[in-house]
Protein backbone atom coordinates (compact mmCIF):
# COMPACT_ATOMS: atom_id res chain seq x y z
CA UNK A 1 0.00 0.00 0.00
CA UNK A 2 1.09 3.56 -0.67
CA UNK A 3 2.13 5.08 2.65
CA UNK A 4 0.81 8.53 1.73
CA UNK A 5 -2.59 7.63 0.26
CA UNK A 6 -3.29 4.05 1.36
CA UNK A 7 -3.83 3.05 -2.26
CA UNK A 8 -3.25 -0.63 -3.03
CA UNK A 9 -0.07 -1.07 -5.07
CA UNK A 10 -0.15 -4.87 -5.42
CA UNK A 11 -1.32 -8.01 -3.66
CA UNK A 12 -0.50 -11.72 -3.85
CA UNK A 13 -2.80 -14.63 -3.00
CA UNK A 14 -1.40 -17.84 -1.47
CA UNK A 15 -2.99 -21.29 -1.40
CA UNK A 16 -2.12 -21.62 2.30
CA UNK A 17 -2.20 -19.24 5.26
CA UNK A 18 0.95 -17.26 5.96
CA UNK A 19 2.55 -17.74 9.38
CA UNK A 20 5.95 -16.05 9.25
CA UNK A 21 7.13 -12.59 8.26
CA UNK A 22 6.86 -10.30 6.46
CA UNK A 23 10.55 -9.38 6.54
CA UNK A 24 11.64 -6.40 4.45
CA UNK A 25 15.03 -7.12 2.85
CA UNK A 26 16.77 -3.84 2.12
CA UNK A 27 14.75 -1.69 -0.27
CA UNK A 28 13.97 -4.28 -2.92
CA UNK A 29 12.61 -7.54 -1.47
CA UNK A 30 10.12 -8.94 1.07
CA UNK A 31 9.98 -12.48 2.48
CA UNK A 32 7.09 -14.51 3.98
CA UNK A 33 6.60 -18.12 5.14
CA UNK A 34 3.41 -20.19 4.80
CA UNK A 35 1.92 -22.93 6.99
CA UNK A 36 3.84 -25.58 5.03
CA UNK A 37 7.16 -23.89 5.72
CA UNK A 38 7.54 -22.67 2.15
CA UNK A 39 9.50 -19.44 1.77
CA UNK A 40 8.44 -16.82 -0.77
CA UNK A 41 10.57 -13.80 -1.65
CA UNK A 42 8.88 -11.04 -3.66
CA UNK A 43 10.04 -7.83 -5.27
CA UNK A 44 8.80 -4.84 -3.26
CA UNK A 45 8.16 -2.71 -6.33
CA UNK A 46 5.47 -4.84 -7.96
CA UNK A 47 5.03 -8.09 -5.97
CA UNK A 48 6.73 -10.26 -8.60
CA UNK A 49 7.93 -13.59 -7.19
CA UNK A 50 11.73 -13.44 -6.92
CA UNK A 51 12.26 -16.99 -5.64
CA UNK A 52 10.67 -19.61 -3.41
CA UNK A 53 11.89 -22.66 -1.51
CA UNK A 54 10.11 -25.67 -0.01
CA UNK A 55 10.34 -26.05 3.77
CA UNK A 56 11.08 -29.11 5.85
CA UNK A 57 8.04 -31.45 5.94
CA UNK A 58 6.78 -32.18 9.48
CA UNK A 59 3.68 -33.91 10.84
CA UNK A 60 2.94 -31.47 13.67
CA UNK A 61 3.60 -27.74 14.00
CA UNK A 62 2.91 -25.09 16.60
CA UNK A 63 0.89 -22.17 15.27
CA UNK A 64 3.02 -19.09 14.81
CA UNK A 65 6.40 -18.82 13.18
CA UNK A 66 9.61 -16.87 13.12
CA UNK A 67 10.26 -14.05 10.72
CA UNK A 68 13.33 -14.46 8.50
CA UNK A 69 16.41 -12.46 9.49
CA UNK A 70 18.89 -11.00 7.04
CA UNK A 71 22.28 -9.34 6.90
CA UNK A 72 24.03 -8.23 3.73
CA UNK A 73 23.53 -11.08 1.24
CA UNK A 74 22.25 -13.76 3.62
CA UNK A 75 18.71 -14.69 4.67
CA UNK A 76 18.24 -16.77 7.83
CA UNK A 77 15.25 -19.09 8.18
CA UNK A 78 14.30 -20.99 11.34
CA UNK A 79 11.10 -22.81 12.14
CA UNK A 80 9.28 -26.14 11.98
CA UNK A 81 11.12 -29.17 13.30
CA UNK A 82 14.01 -27.07 14.61
CA UNK A 83 15.41 -26.48 11.12
CA UNK A 84 17.84 -23.59 10.64
CA UNK A 85 19.07 -22.59 7.19
CA UNK A 86 20.90 -19.68 5.59
CA UNK A 87 20.19 -18.74 1.98
CA UNK A 88 21.83 -16.49 -0.58
CA UNK A 89 19.35 -13.62 -0.89
CA UNK A 90 19.69 -13.08 -4.62
CA UNK A 91 19.21 -16.72 -5.67
CA UNK A 92 17.70 -18.57 -2.71
CA UNK A 93 20.56 -21.09 -2.81
CA UNK A 94 21.19 -22.80 0.53
CA UNK A 95 24.55 -21.87 2.05
CA UNK A 96 24.18 -24.23 5.01
CA UNK A 97 21.56 -25.91 7.18
CA UNK A 98 21.40 -27.37 10.70
CA UNK A 99 18.83 -28.34 13.31
CA UNK A 100 18.11 -27.39 16.92
CA UNK A 101 15.64 -30.21 17.50
CA UNK A 102 16.19 -32.00 20.81
CA UNK A 103 18.16 -35.23 20.56
CA UNK A 104 16.65 -36.53 23.82
CA UNK A 105 13.31 -34.76 24.43
CA UNK A 106 12.02 -34.97 28.01
CA UNK A 107 8.53 -33.57 27.40
CA UNK A 108 6.01 -33.46 24.54
CA UNK A 109 6.80 -29.74 24.17
CA UNK A 110 10.49 -30.46 23.62
CA UNK A 111 9.73 -33.22 21.11
CA UNK A 112 7.95 -30.77 18.79
CA UNK A 113 11.19 -28.87 18.30
CA UNK A 114 9.64 -25.90 16.48
CA UNK A 115 11.54 -22.62 16.68
CA UNK A 116 9.23 -19.75 17.63
CA UNK A 117 11.87 -17.11 18.45
CA UNK A 118 13.07 -14.97 15.55
CA UNK A 119 16.68 -15.75 14.58
CA UNK A 120 19.32 -13.01 14.83
CA UNK A 121 22.16 -12.29 12.36
CA UNK A 122 24.77 -9.78 13.59
CA UNK A 123 26.95 -9.92 10.49
CA UNK A 124 29.34 -12.47 11.95
CA UNK A 125 27.23 -15.07 13.70
CA UNK A 126 23.65 -16.36 13.61
CA UNK A 127 21.90 -16.88 16.97
CA UNK A 128 18.91 -19.19 17.32
CA UNK A 129 16.99 -20.52 20.33
CA UNK A 130 14.45 -23.35 20.23
CA UNK A 131 11.77 -24.40 22.68
CA UNK A 132 13.36 -27.87 22.64
CA UNK A 133 16.14 -26.66 24.94
CA UNK A 134 18.94 -25.57 22.60
CA UNK A 135 20.42 -22.09 22.13
CA UNK A 136 23.30 -21.87 19.67
CA UNK A 137 25.54 -19.49 17.76
CA UNK A 138 26.63 -20.42 14.24
CA UNK A 139 29.28 -18.93 12.00
CA UNK A 140 27.21 -17.10 9.39
CA UNK A 141 29.44 -18.11 6.49
CA UNK A 142 30.20 -21.76 7.20
CA UNK A 143 27.40 -22.85 9.53
CA UNK A 144 29.96 -24.09 12.08
CA UNK A 145 28.40 -24.12 15.56
CA UNK A 146 30.54 -21.75 17.62
CA UNK A 147 28.87 -22.58 20.95
CA UNK A 148 25.66 -23.96 22.46
CA UNK A 149 23.73 -23.88 25.75
CA UNK A 150 20.79 -26.01 26.98
CA UNK A 151 18.35 -23.08 27.16
CA UNK A 152 14.77 -23.31 25.89
CA UNK A 153 13.06 -20.15 24.70
CA UNK A 154 10.41 -18.69 22.43
CA UNK A 155 11.47 -15.03 22.45
CA UNK A 156 13.91 -13.14 20.25
CA UNK A 157 17.43 -12.98 21.75
CA UNK A 158 18.58 -9.35 22.06
CA UNK A 159 22.11 -8.30 21.15
CA UNK A 160 23.63 -5.24 22.83
CA UNK A 161 27.35 -4.50 22.70
CA UNK A 162 29.30 -7.71 23.13
CA UNK A 163 26.48 -9.53 24.94
CA UNK A 164 23.30 -11.38 24.02
CA UNK A 165 20.31 -11.43 26.38
CA UNK A 166 17.50 -13.97 26.44
CA UNK A 167 14.61 -15.18 28.58
CA UNK A 168 14.09 -18.92 29.02
CA UNK A 169 10.87 -20.92 29.25
CA UNK A 170 11.85 -21.88 32.80
CA UNK A 171 11.79 -18.23 33.93
CA UNK A 172 15.44 -17.14 33.80
CA UNK A 173 16.91 -13.98 32.31
CA UNK A 174 20.36 -14.75 30.94
CA UNK A 175 23.27 -12.68 29.63
CA UNK A 176 26.04 -14.33 27.59
CA UNK A 177 29.22 -13.15 25.90
CA UNK A 178 28.83 -13.18 22.11
CA UNK A 179 32.32 -14.37 21.25
CA UNK A 180 32.35 -17.65 23.15
CA UNK A 181 28.95 -18.01 24.83
CA UNK A 182 30.32 -17.57 28.35
CA UNK A 183 27.48 -16.92 30.81
CA UNK A 184 27.85 -13.48 32.36
CA UNK A 185 24.89 -13.73 34.73
CA UNK A 186 21.53 -15.42 35.30
CA UNK A 187 18.57 -13.80 37.09
CA UNK A 188 15.70 -15.91 38.40
CA UNK A 189 12.33 -14.35 37.52
CA UNK A 190 9.07 -14.42 39.46
CA UNK A 191 7.32 -17.77 38.99
CA UNK A 192 10.46 -19.47 37.70
CA UNK A 193 10.38 -23.26 37.55
CA UNK A 194 12.57 -25.10 40.08
CA UNK A 195 16.11 -25.87 38.97
CA UNK A 196 16.22 -29.08 36.96
CA UNK A 197 12.48 -29.19 36.20
CA UNK A 198 11.74 -29.89 32.55
CA UNK A 199 10.15 -27.19 30.41
CA UNK A 200 6.36 -27.47 30.28
CA UNK A 201 3.50 -25.46 28.82
CA UNK A 202 2.49 -24.15 32.26
CA UNK A 203 5.73 -22.28 32.95
CA UNK A 204 5.99 -18.49 33.43
CA UNK A 205 5.57 -16.39 30.28
CA UNK A 206 7.79 -13.36 29.79
CA UNK A 207 8.00 -11.27 26.62
CA UNK A 208 11.22 -9.63 25.51
CA UNK A 209 13.90 -8.82 26.49
CA UNK A 210 14.68 -5.32 25.30
CA UNK A 211 17.96 -3.63 26.23
CA UNK A 212 18.12 0.18 26.42
CA UNK A 213 20.11 2.73 28.44
CA UNK A 214 21.98 0.02 30.32
CA UNK A 215 18.79 -1.74 31.41
CA UNK A 216 17.12 -5.00 30.39
CA UNK A 217 13.32 -4.78 30.24
CA UNK A 218 10.88 -7.69 30.34
CA UNK A 219 7.09 -7.72 30.04
CA UNK A 220 5.15 -10.44 31.84
CA UNK A 221 1.94 -11.87 30.43
CA UNK A 222 -0.06 -10.04 33.10
CA UNK A 223 1.37 -6.60 32.32
CA UNK A 224 4.30 -6.28 34.71
CA UNK A 225 7.36 -4.50 33.28
CA UNK A 226 10.53 -5.55 35.12
CA UNK A 227 13.89 -3.78 34.85
CA UNK A 228 17.34 -5.27 35.39
CA UNK A 229 20.90 -3.93 35.30
CA UNK A 230 22.41 -5.05 32.00
CA UNK A 231 25.88 -5.41 33.56
CA UNK A 232 25.06 -7.72 36.47
CA UNK A 233 21.38 -8.74 36.25
CA UNK A 234 20.36 -7.03 39.49
CA UNK A 235 16.65 -6.17 39.69
CA UNK A 236 16.00 -2.42 39.44
CA UNK A 237 12.25 -2.36 39.97
CA UNK A 238 9.00 -2.99 38.16
CA UNK A 239 5.91 -1.18 36.88
CA UNK A 240 2.44 -2.61 36.30
CA UNK A 241 0.49 -1.44 33.25
CA UNK A 242 -2.27 -4.03 33.67
CA UNK A 243 -3.92 -6.11 30.99
CA UNK A 244 -2.98 -9.37 29.29
CA UNK A 245 -0.14 -9.62 26.78
CA UNK A 246 0.92 -12.10 24.09
CA UNK A 247 2.91 -9.77 21.81
CA UNK A 248 6.51 -8.87 22.70
CA UNK A 249 7.22 -5.19 23.41
CA UNK A 250 9.36 -3.09 21.12
CA UNK A 251 11.53 -0.01 21.48
CA UNK A 252 12.02 2.92 19.13
CA UNK A 253 13.49 6.44 19.48
CA UNK A 254 13.67 6.17 23.26
CA UNK A 255 10.13 4.84 23.67
CA UNK A 256 8.96 1.47 25.07
CA UNK A 257 5.85 0.25 23.23
CA UNK A 258 3.44 -2.55 24.19
CA UNK A 259 0.27 -3.92 22.61
CA UNK A 260 -2.16 -5.82 24.85
CA UNK A 261 -4.30 -8.80 23.86
CA UNK A 262 -7.34 -6.49 23.87
CA UNK A 263 -5.67 -4.04 21.48
CA UNK A 264 -4.55 -1.34 23.92
CA UNK A 265 -1.36 0.41 22.82
CA UNK A 266 0.87 1.77 25.61
CA UNK A 267 3.88 4.00 24.94
CA UNK A 268 6.36 4.80 27.72
CA UNK A 269 9.46 6.99 27.68
Regions found by a protein language model. Name each.
Residues 2-5, 43-47, 89-92, 139-142, ...:
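Short loop/turn segments that connect beta-strands within beta-propeller blades
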Residues 8-26, 49-72, 97-121, 145-161, ...:
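Extracytoplasmic beta-rich repeat domains
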Residues 29-30, 75, 126, 164, ...:
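Hydrophobic beta-strand positions that form the internal "hydrophobic ladder"
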Residues 34-35, 79-80, 130-131, 168-169, ...:
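Structural signature of WD-repeat beta-propellers
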Residues 83-87, 93-99, 109, 138, ...:
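Extracytoplasmic and endomembrane cell-envelope/extracellular-matrix remodeling and assembly machinery
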Residues 163-178, 182, 186-227:
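Loop/turn-rich, solvent-exposed surfaces of beta-rich toroidal or solenoidal domains
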Residues 214-263, 269:
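C-terminal closing repeat unit and adjoining cap/tail of repeat-based domains
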Amino acid sequence: MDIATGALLWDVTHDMALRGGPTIIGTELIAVIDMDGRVFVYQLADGTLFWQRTGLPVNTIIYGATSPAFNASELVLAGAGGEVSVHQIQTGDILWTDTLASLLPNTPLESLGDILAHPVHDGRQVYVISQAGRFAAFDAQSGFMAWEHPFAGSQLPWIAGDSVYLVTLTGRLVSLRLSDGMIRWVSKLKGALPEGKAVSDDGPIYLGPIVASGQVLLLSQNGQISRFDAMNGNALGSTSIGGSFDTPPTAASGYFVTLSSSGNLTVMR
